[in-house]
């Protein structure tokens, strides 16, 4: 299945309004490890949530922009004023187990750099829509795929 999974942050609220925090989160995630653990090694690491088939919008130079580097992630968090990390909750659609499994791996990787992640299962698209309409600033997990 061609599927892009991503965590979407509200860049207007702390701590996600800080570019160094967002960069730290990128460096903290080992995308290849996720594919190895969740998809039996299948998949392609992307540098954005734009599917490569959308060639007009996909930027291949982003693929290697943030290589897995937990030391760099910790350094950026400290520079951003979070030397001990911070707490965050990620809302994840619970209607598809691979989303939940992937979110658990991401949470573990973020915890390794000091970001204490709690996963909040949501009842699929309806729960996510309610959360978005309510203006909740919580990070959200989302996945999408191209439709022929």
Which role does the model predict for each range below?
Residues 49-50, 69, 88-91, 122:
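Beta-strand segments within the central parallel beta-sheet cores of soluble alpha/beta enzyme folds
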Residues 2, 31, 50-51, 124, ...:
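Beta->alpha turn/N-cap motifs
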Residues 3-47, 74-76, 87-99:
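Alpha-helical secondary-structure segments
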Residues 24, 28, 37, 76-80, ...:
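Generic, well-ordered alpha-helical scaffold segments in large soluble proteins
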Residues 45-79, 96-101:
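Structural transition elements
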Residues 90, 102, 108-148:
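Periplasmic binding protein-like
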